[in-house]
Amino acid sequence: MATIQVSVITPDGAVYEGDAELVVVKTVEGELGIKAKHIPLVSPLAVGPARFIKEGKEEQVAVSSGFVEVRPDHVSILAEAAERPEQIDTERARKAKERAEQRLASEHVDRKRAEAALQRAITRMDVAKHKGA
């Protein structure tokens, strides 16, 4: 199967470079699957995992919003923050999840910020499960 080049870039530099048969990202409109020769597009990303599948194996990167730019031969994910599974501190993510849940239980809270923090923590914990995969 044909592959497409993939780059995940943050303000701190490249987090992932490789090629994949299928790239799946979470956009603000829902999940988007991308294969080689996809039509060009740019879409805002939601917090979620970016998945890269090649030869039946899947790699993931936790993405904290940004944009995806698709060209027929390359996918660029420009993220505010992104982490590979081995970079994620699962204990820190678990504590962030607990704090976000506590804030959401409070009456006087910026719900949008607390929900975003909760989603980031859940995404990081889910992606961390792919360490060594």
UniProtKB/Swiss-Prot annotation:
Its membrane topology: Peripheral membrane protein
Region feature (Disordered): 81-110
One GO cellular component term: proton-transporting ATP synthase complex
Any Pfam family hit: ATP-synt_DE
Assembly with partners or alone: F-type ATPases have 2 components, CF(1) - the catalytic core - and CF(0) - the membrane proton channel. CF(1) has five subunits: alpha(3), beta(3), gamma(1), delta(1), epsilon(1). CF(0) has three main subunits: a, b and c.
PANTHER family tied to this protein: ATP SYNTHASE DELTA/EPSILON CHAIN (PTHR13822), ATP SYNTHASE EPSILON CHAIN, CHLOROPLASTIC (PTHR13822:SF10)
Full protein name: ATP synthase epsilon chain
